[in-house]
Amino acid sequence: MARKKISLIGGGQIGGVLAQLCALRELGDVVMFDIVEGLPQGKMLDIAEVGPVDGFDVCLKGTNSYADIAGSDVVIVTAGLPRKPGMSRDDLIEVNSKIMTQVAEGIKQYAPNSFVIVISNPLDAMVTLCQKITGFPYNRVIGQAGVLDSSRFAAFIAWELGVSVKDVVAVTLGGHGDDMVPLVRYTSVCGIPVMELLERKYKDKAKAKEVMEAMVKRTRGAGGEVVALLKTGSAFYSPASAAIAMTESILKDQKRVLPTCCFLQGEFGVNGYYVGVPAVLGENGVEQIIQFNLDAEEQAMMDKSVAAVKSLVDSLK
């Protein structure tokens, strides 16, 4: 049986971590494309040379030619400029939309049967543009945002409560920006509602609410927090790991329910836009969008987030 093939578009920080994770997990052979001559070749050679130490056996190739992504099962797009301190994700739209246009044309020509996972920011606009240019079915073009946002939310909760991150289940909806919607009501620790645990810890409902609001705020600004600390770029370990979870679910048909930037056609009252929602990811890409009820406050936050997505995406038209 032929190995799976994963192509990474963009040889920056995220691309490098993606390549290493793909190799360590032996998800398939990996190609890294970048326009900078020598960069993808050097990174892939560096990773390949540690195969005997880490015990992975896959083919790793760096390239400056889109032709080398032919036959890809999954293409992960990280190409684009990262944020700098003081910038929002939306500030990147003009330059990164030009880059995404070229990338999508390359994918369309050389990997027409692939699944595409977009990481580039501003995410909601970039995945929309990628799908529009490739013309691929909506189930085959998705964006990575919610897995990372939910992971950050879960981490903050675990640290606050002093419990294992493995036992926290959290979910975020909406766009990948300051208006994302961390769903407190659906967040739990080993099945126990998180607010109940916070209220028991502080023995004060008002204090518990205050602590949760701070964690929600931190989740919304988590990417910017990393940017401010790094000063020279944006997060790369965490978005790479999040994209790998999605890739693995597709390649291995795991049917995992993961927060995914999907094209909505009426779900959650949204029609014709890519928005973050829980979805089943399997061998057919997005196989099912998981719908559930939102209360009035949650719906209002979702509406605000979707409005921000629409404004950003419509600016591309």
From Swiss-Prot:
Is Oxidoreductase tagged as a keyword? yes
Cite the SUPFAM superfamilies for this sequence.
Answer: LDH C-terminal domain-like, NAD(P)-binding Rossmann-fold domains
InterPro entries registered for this protein in UniProt:
L-lactate/malate_DH (IPR001557), Lactate/malate_DH_C (IPR022383), Lactate/malate_DH_N (IPR001236), Lactate_DH/Glyco_Ohase_4_C (IPR015955), Malate_DH_type3 (IPR011275), NAD(P)-bd_dom_sf (IPR036291)
Residues the record lists as binding substrate? 83, 89, 121, 152
Q: What does the UniProt keyword field contain?
A: NAD, Oxidoreductase, Tricarboxylic acid cycle
Q: Name the Enzyme Commission number(s) assigned to this protein.
A: 1.1.1.37
A GO term for molecular function = L-malate dehydrogenase (NAD+) activity
**Active site at which residues?**
176 (proton acceptor)
Q: What class of enzyme is it?
A: oxidoreductase
Binding annotation for NAD(+): 10-15, 34, 96, 119-121
Which reactions fall under this protein's catalytic activity?
Answer: (S)-malate + NAD(+) = oxaloacetate + NADH + H(+)
Question: What biological-process GO terms show up in the record?
Answer: lactate metabolic process; tricarboxylic acid cycle
Entry-linked HAMAP family = Malate_dehydrog_3 (MF_00487)
Q: Which NCBIfam families is this protein grouped with? A: MalateDH_bact (TIGR01763), PRK06223.1 (NF004863)
Question: What is the purpose of this protein?
Answer: Catalyzes the reversible oxidation of malate to oxaloacetate.
Q: Which PANTHER family match?
A: L-2-HYDROXYCARBOXYLATE DEHYDROGENASE (NAD(P)(+)), L-LACTATE DEHYDROGENASE
Q: Which family does it belong to?
A: Belongs to the LDH/MDH superfamily. MDH type 3 family.
This chain's protein is named: Malate dehydrogenase
